[in-house]
Swiss-Prot record:
Record note on quaternary structure: Homodimer.
Organism encoding this protein: Paracoccus denitrificans (strain Pd 1222)
Pfam family, one: Radical_SAM
Family of the protein in this entry: Belongs to the radical SAM superfamily. Biotin synthase family.
Protein name (database record): Biotin synthase 2
Gene that produces this protein: bioB2
Length: 320
């Protein structure tokens, strides 16, 4: 059956060997299958977020014991960025636990973008919802990518978040694209959603006016004190199916194997790479979640014959 005539559900639910073969075929048509993009993520403002995202330890409404911090000083952010570049990162992603940026913080945020850009790395930020003017100012400062995940399907969304709507997220993505910034948008799996919710989420992303340049697929890492702290872990094959379907639906996008890698075996990660994932975050922390240390990633890359994308060949990137 020709790919374009099949529904996303037919792609997702087909026999796994067929799904993996098709995903790897699509992947090889657009990317070197042995190259993985490596990005670094820094939390520039942690905790105290007014949103009620059920998965997030940074929400002030959840019962986690995470303390709120102030916005990190610009020079400290740039020092961390230099270390990331020296360690091989080709793009630098900065995240703040906000509903949306406040005007008083914009000068510092813009200075961070300009400073990281001057180092020769690509820049990405995730700051919450944006209005049109904020998006244009970020673009003018040199922002390459903006991350704003849709998290899950429109149907399941209100089970996870009530303080902003699914449409709010779509409108922010539209403003980012209108400003000329590349979009990074994905979601989280393993939050109690159905396979149909995962499929619907991917259909929404692929159906944007321009599909995201980067699609982070996060596997829920249950955080103590959050409403999802005791959600059963998603079956590994469902994660692989999600990655493979994302690759087929968005063939030219980077598909990032994002949060949750610290809980995955080498074999599971290898299957995700074979399914079309070609981007990861490096470093031992993703905002507030754990991540494999860089030595462990180096060993895995050596075992699988993978190599990190070099800056000269780099094209896309973003946050979790």
């Amino acid at each position: 059956m020709p790919q374009q005539s099949r529904s996303a559900a037919e792609i997702y639910h087909q026999p796994l060997m067929d799904l993996l073969f098709q995903a790897q075929t699509v992947h090889r048509a657009h990317f070197d299958p042995n190259v993985v993009q490596c990005s670094k993520l820094l939390s520039i403002k942690t905790g105290g977020c007014p949103e009620d995202c059920a998965y997030c330890s940074q929400s002030a409404r959840n019962g986690s014991e995470l303390s709120a911090s102030k916005l990190m000083e610009v020079q400290r952010v740039l020092a961390e960025a230099r270390r990331a570049k020296e360690a091989g990162a080709t793009r630098y992603c900065m995240g703040a636990a906000w509903r949306s940026p406040k005007e008083r913080d914009m000068p510092a945020v813009l200075a961070m973008i300009r400073g990281v850009k001057a180092m020769g790395m690509e820049t990405c930020m995730t700051l919450g919802m944006l209005d049109a003017d904020q998006a244009l100012r970020l673009k003018d400062a040199g922002l390459d990518y903006y991350n704003h995940n849709i998290d899950t399907s429109e149907r399941y969304y209100s089970e996870i978040i009530t303080t902003r709507t699914f449409q709010d997220r779509i409108e922010t993505l539209e403003r980012v694209q209108a400003a000329g910034i590349n979009v990074c948008a994905g979601g989280i799996v393993g939050m109690g959603e159905t396979a149909e919710d995962r499929i619907s989420m991917l259909e929404t992303l692929a159906g944007l006016e321009v599909p995201p340049q980067s699609v982070p697929i996060n596997m829920l890492m249950p955080m103590a004190g959050t409403p999802l702290a005791d959600v059963p872990r998603l079956d590994a094959i469902e994660m692989v199916r999600t990655i493979a379907t994302a690759r087929i639906l968005m063939p030219a996008s980077y598909v990032r194997l994002s949060a949750g890698r610290s809980e995955m075996s080498d074999e599971m990660q290898a299957m995700c790479f074979f399914a079309g994932a070609n981007s990861i975050f490096v470093g031992d922390t993703l905002l507030t979640a754990g991540n494999p240390d860089e030595d462990k990633d180096a060993l895995l890359f050596a075992k699988l014959g993978l190599r990190a994308e070099v800056p000269e060949a780099s094209q896309e990137g973003c946050a979790a």
